């Protein structure tokens, strides 16, 4: 099964989730694997109790993860890692990506680096928390002594529209960075 548990707005505006879903379905077809897709809208009750295995994309809260574990213990999350004690996960190393971006900008002579990002969510509360990309950016920029809070813009969600809006907002500032990590 493919558990495609993205928020409706994420699915429409976050290219990452849509590309992951499309590629999973494409690869499954190539290998003659039938994947039944269950969405967040379908709810946890739609997932069959005799599920053999799953691939999950999107965000689940603690209650949903525990319920899923009672249904099926063989699953892999892509893009998120909600509970590494219960399920495996495949996700990009965002910490390394951001560190490499800041290193690259510094190597190219940039000393003013901006950052546009969004929040993560606490798995237990669902409340916003600092995303690993922002944390990594702050650590890397601090290391190079070039952290400038005026150049850090955080939205309440990860969407193309929000990134565009924050980029335009950054351009209205009196001084702007010479490089930007988005």
Features from the language model and the residues they span:
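Short, charged/polar "capping" segments at the starts of alpha-helices
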Residues: 44, 62-65
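Bacterial carbohydrate/catabolite-sensing allosteric modules
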Residues: 1-8, 15-37, 41, 52-53, ...
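Short, well-ordered secondary-structure micro-motifs within conserved domains or adaptor modules
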Residues: 46-59
């Amino acid at each position: 099964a493919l558990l495609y548990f993205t928020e409706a707005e994420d699915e429409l505006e976050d290219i990452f989730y849509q590309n992951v879903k499309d590629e999973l379905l494409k690869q499954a077809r190539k290998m003659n694997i039938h994947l039944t897709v269950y969405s967040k809208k379908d709810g946890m009750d739609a997932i069959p109790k005799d599920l053999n295995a799953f691939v999950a994309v999107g965000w689940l809260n603690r209650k949903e993860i525990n319920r899923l574990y009672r249904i099926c213990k063989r699953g892999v999350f892509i893009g998120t890692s909600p509970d590494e004690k219960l399920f495996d996960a495949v996700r990009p190393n965002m910490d390394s990506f951001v560190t490499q971006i800041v290193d690259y900008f510094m190597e190219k002579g940039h000393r003013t680096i901006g950052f546009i990002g969004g929040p993560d969510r606490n798995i237990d509360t669902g409340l916003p928390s600092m995303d690993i990309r922002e944390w990594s950016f702050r650590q890397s920029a601090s290391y190079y002594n070039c952290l400038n809070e005026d150049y850090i813009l955080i939205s309440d969600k990860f969407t193309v529209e929000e990134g565009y809006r924050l980029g335009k907002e950054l351009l209205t500032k009196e001084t702007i960075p010479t490089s930007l990590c988005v």
